[in-house]
Amino acid sequence: MHQVTIYVVASPVPINWEGPADLYKSALKSLSKRILRSQARIVGHTLVVLNSSHIEGTRAYSISGIKLIEVIKRIFKEKIGLGILGSVFKAEMESEQIIDRTLRFNSRKGRVLFIKYLINEASAKRIIDFFDKFENKFNHHHAPMDFYGGFLWPLYENEGAGCTALCLCTLIAGNLVNDETEEWKVHCKIPIKLIGGRYNKGNKVSVRDIKSTKEWHNGGGIEGVDFIPLEIYDPNMMFNWIKKTFESNDSYFKPVTENGIPGLLVDCRDLDIEGETAPFTKRPAISSFITEYYIQAGLM
C-alpha cells in the first residue's frame, strides 16, 4: 500500500488577497491571534505524510522558516515592504512532535482538513526521489531543505520551498495534480514601489505605503520595472476548497473522517506513470528574490 496525505491548516484569521492593504490588515489580525498560541500559523500551513513499502514507517515533511523577529526586522528596520513575500529564510524541517502538536491544536479549533491520495508504486518512487533530492546537499554546505521562501519552487534544481510549494511539488512529482489546484492559487502583480531593500535598489517601504495601496498593479507595464508577478498557493484557499468539496457529492473525491479530522480520499492507483524520478527542471527566469537565494545557497 502506498499513499500520500496533504494536511492543510487554516490561519486563525482568513488572509485577504484583494490588495496590499487588505493583505497587511488580515495578516496583522491573524498574528494577533497567534501571539499566545505558537501552534497556530499566521498565514496557514501545509504538510505532507508519506506511507510506502519502499520506506521504513511513516515519513512526515513539514517545512517552516518564518521567524517573527526576523519578519519584524525586515519590514520595520530594513523596510523591504512586500519584498517579505519573496524573502528567503533559514528553513527548519519540523519534528514529528511539532507536527503532532500543530495538528492536534488546530484540529480542536476546526482548522485542519486533508486530502489523502492512494497511489501506485511508480508514483511513490517518484515522490521518494523528490524528497531524497530535497534533503540531500547540492554542494558542501547546503541542501534545498535548508531554505524557505515564497518564491522558491523545489522542482527547480537546487531550490528550497515554502510549505505549499513543497506539497504541490510532491503531488506533481507523483503525477497527482488536476485542475482543482488552480483554485488554490493566488495570482497578483506586486507594485514595484512596495518592494524595498535588497530587492529594489535600497528602496524604503513603510507600513503606511502598504496600508495606503488598495489594489495590486493592473494593466500594462514591464515586469521587474513596474511590478513583480506573484503566484503562490494559499493554505486558506486549499482549506476552503477541501471544505466545499467535502460538503458536495463529488464522485472523484470521497469525503472521509480520520482521527476526528474531515478530509477527502481519492484513488489514483490506476494512473499511468512513466519513469521513477521526479521531473526536476532548470528555472527559466531569475528575479531579485531568486538572485538572493542563489547567493545565500552558494549557487552564484
Describe the role of every protein-language-model region.
Residues 6-109, 270-273, 277-284, 290:
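Glycine-rich catalytic cores of cysteine/serine-nucleophile enzymes that process amide/ester linkages
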